[in-house]
Amino acid sequence: MAKGYTQKEGIDYDETFSPVAMLKSIRILLSIAAYYDYEIWQMDVKTAFLNGNLDEEIYMMQSEGFIAKNQEHMVCKLKRSIYGLNQASRSWNIRFDQVIKSFGFEQNLDEPCVYKRHQDKVVMFLVLYVDDILLIGNDVGVMSSIKVWLSSQFDMKDLGEANFILGIKLCRDRKNKMLGLSQAGYIDKVLERFSMQNSKKGLLPFRHGVPLSDDQRPKTQEEVNTMRQVPYASAVGSLMYAMLCTRPDICYSVGMVSRYQSNPGPKHWQAVKHILKYLWRTRDYMLIYRCEDLIPIGYTDSDFQSDLDFRKSTSGCVFTLGGGAITWRSVKQSCIVDSTMEAKYVAACEVAKEAVWLKKFLSNFGIVRIEQVPITLFCDNSGAVAQSKDPRNHKKGKYIERNYHIIRDIIARGDVVVAKIESANNLADPFTKALPQRTFESHLEGMGVRLVHNSL
């Protein structure tokens, strides 16, 4: 391994950025695979970073134990990239990009680690996540030839039909065209890591009537000493990975506890343990994609100044495709708003920009026909819906910052249409506030998060 920390920028390396596939892109492709009953295969590149070509002249000392006799004063000139170099991941990504394009694959312009090969009725998708390759397609013969060709270019490990992707278990019922994503094994490890495997099981990931704030930070030296022994940041990080992959149901709760990582108090830690207890009860929940209409639908919502520290609102959104959630978000707004309408208008603007990316990403595939059809974005506030369509100068909207009016341009060019929906049917509601159990679980059903018995 090279001592990359001794490299000098501008001399030994220049750019170091290397993209990886986004989790939402993987979920979208899995939803498409479930709808069309595509094959899902997996491969792994052995020692991937040794395949990159170097543009710079890099020298390194001879490795200990392999020093050439009578040439102890000599150094090695690298012909290829190796682990430890600052540019190693970038060199590998560039090499793979060149190789896969030479075999007829086209790169998705809006997701550089997703490739497509479409010829006649044969459809192939390839996803690259560092050294993990996901191959999705409808022709076993062509897919086999791709695997043979990749093996001729790199040292590959054929993992066959995909069962685990980045720690996510894939469960398929091909007869009913259903695909489930489960992190039960990961959740078990998290519970054991934080000694919660024998705790009581929680009904919800949040506690009603117990808002979090900066006032709950440690106030006495005893509390400070106690919290120093608590693995708060590690627990939040572990929860966040589950939330980002397959568990939109804990998105709001994880977002709330993550705001206090710099100096958490006992009540903040109790909130984290409450989420762990909920995951203990729902460890077998899956994110399910079914053979439903392959039309993306968006939902947006916001609360009003629920943040007790800065009086800012929380925006929430979720997009579904094929009966399951493909992307979701719960974030604190960057501005202070003056009304509920303004809060929901700001939230809708951010979601509309996500819809633009989603439409471009899907249009590039050529199998989801949405080029001429706008994505429907549901909002439960009539004022925000009206404000998004036409300029309205009234006392509740005249203070809205100009940059949020981009949603009108997005609507005008036909990328998005904003429609009114009842709050009870708004799937984005759980991303902005704590809900009663029955309402919360009905929204989970709409997002495809459920317990499946003997179906997958």
Model-derived segments and their meaning:
Residues 1-155:
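Metal/cofactor- and membrane transport-associated sequence elements
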Residues 3-5, 239, 299-341:
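RNase H-like nuclease fold core
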Residues 7-12, 49-54, 307-311, 328-331, ...:
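Cytochrome P450 core scaffold surrounding the K-helix E-X-X-R motif
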Residues 24, 30, 82, 130, ...:
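C-terminal reverse transcriptase regions that engage the nucleic-acid substrate
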Residues 29, 44, 60, 84, ...:
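Mobile genetic element proteins and their domesticated derivatives, centered on retroelements
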Residues 32-37, 277-302, 370-371:
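Structured nucleic-acid-interacting core domains from mobile-element enzymes and related host factors
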Residues 95-130, 134, 143, 153-162, ...:
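Active-site palm subdomain of RNA-directed nucleic acid polymerases
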Residues 164, 169, 293-295, 331-456:
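RNase H-like nuclease module associated with reverse transcription
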